[in-house]
Regions:
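Acidic, metal-coordinating helix/loop segments flanking the phosphotransfer/catalytic sites
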Residues: 37-55
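Two-component/phosphorelay signaling modules centered on CheY-like receiver
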Residues: 18-36, 101
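Receiver (REC) domain active-site loop signature in two-component systems and cognate sites
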Residues: 62
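Alpha4 helix (beta4-alpha4-beta5 surface) of REC/receiver domains from two-component response regulators
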Residues: 69, 90-105
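Non-catalytic signal-transmission and effector/linker regions of two-component phosphorelay proteins
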Residues: 1-12, 18-25, 46, 75, ...
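A Lys-centered signature of the CheY-like receiver
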Residues: 109
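Acidic catalytic/metal-coordinating carboxylates
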Residues: 39-40, 66-70
């Protein structure tokens, strides 16, 4: 990965699980990403970080607005932020459906650091 590019890339983590919001940013910062964590989709939408976000790591099942609902809302608003979904739901039919709707990747918890970093690298890679 081009480390200069990664330093300009804000990765937003949206997950209602506090342990995910604490651990993922630490990992991603080690690899040069700027990271902001949010406890809900609504919190992310209300932040000033939409413009800077280059990749969204998004839990599927959250109270209030779900991850899929947030993806649809961003698409409705014309925000083409690449999404990497993460989920504890092992339903294998989810992944192809999410990829069909524009997600970069769907990772099942627990996932490897390598798989997550590969998905983010793919999401932030310049076209």
């Amino acid at each position: 990965m081009n480390s200069e590019y990664s330093k300009r890339s804000l990765v937003a983590v949206v997950d209602d699980d506090e342990s995910v919001r604490e651990s993922l940013p630490d990992l991603l910062r080690e690899f040069g990403y700027a990271v902001q964590a949010f406890a809900s989709a609504e919190e992310f939408l209300g932040s000033g970080d939409l413009v800077r976000t280059r990749c969204l790591i998004l839990d599927i099942a959250m109270p209030g607005m779900s991850g899929r609902d947030l993806q649809r809302e961003l698409q409705r608003r014309g925000w083409g932020i690449p999404v990497v979904f993460i989920t504890a739901n092992r339903d294998e039919t989810l992944r192809p459906h999410l990829l069909e709707r524009g997600a970069v990747e769907c990772l099942f918890k627990p996932f490897s650091d390598t798989a997550l970093l590969a998905a983010i690298s793919s999401a932030v890679r310049p076209a």
